[in-house]
Amino acid sequence: RINGAEWDGYRYGMNYDSWVRMVDFASEQGFAYLVLDANWYGPEFEKNSDPVTGEKAKDVQRIIKYGKEKGVGIWLYLNDVAGTNYPIEETLKQYEEWGAAGVKYGFMNGNSQQKNEKTRQITELCAKHHLLINFHDYPVHPYGQERTWPNAVTREYCKAQLDGHQTFEPKTFVTSVFVNMIAGPIDMNNGF
């Protein structure tokens, strides 16, 4: 998340010009993807934040097109509030039509059984609509899902320490990652 960050005399925001700078940087560095994180479609935990027609939907479509021209795929953040309050399949179909590369799905609610079922459903729908998927913020544990669904590239199973403002000690951090990766790929970031 770079919203509000300053670098090289430029203050980044949740806007098209900042996204262009990020795509240009990603392209120059050979990065395949860039994620438009939380709040691009409105305040992420408000039920009326529409993940298809939200605040910056037109700019998102423009940056996806620009990213393709630069060889950078754009992933779109989508959380469980929007995924539950708006038709998930229609949303993912729209992202496919826009040309998005993938979805970072966050803050899934429910008990373990509900989360497992929702993980399977969303992964299958993303595959149907040619989208990669990364489950973020307390998803179900890795279980080899990517064997059936190769579009399920990772999940943040080891807690978003950056968001939680917590840290693991180095030994615990490394051990946790490698033990959990036995079952499948994960992403993890240490906090502060």
Task: Indicate residue ranges for each PLM-predicted region.
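Structured mid-domain segments that build the active-site/substrate or prosthetic-cofactor binding neighborhood
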Residues: 34
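Short loop/turn motifs at secondary-structure junctions
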Residues: 29-31, 99
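Aromatic- and carboxylate-enriched substrate-binding clefts and catalytic-loop regions
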Residues: 37-192
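An acidic-aromatic substrate-binding cleft motif
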Residues: 1-20, 24, 29
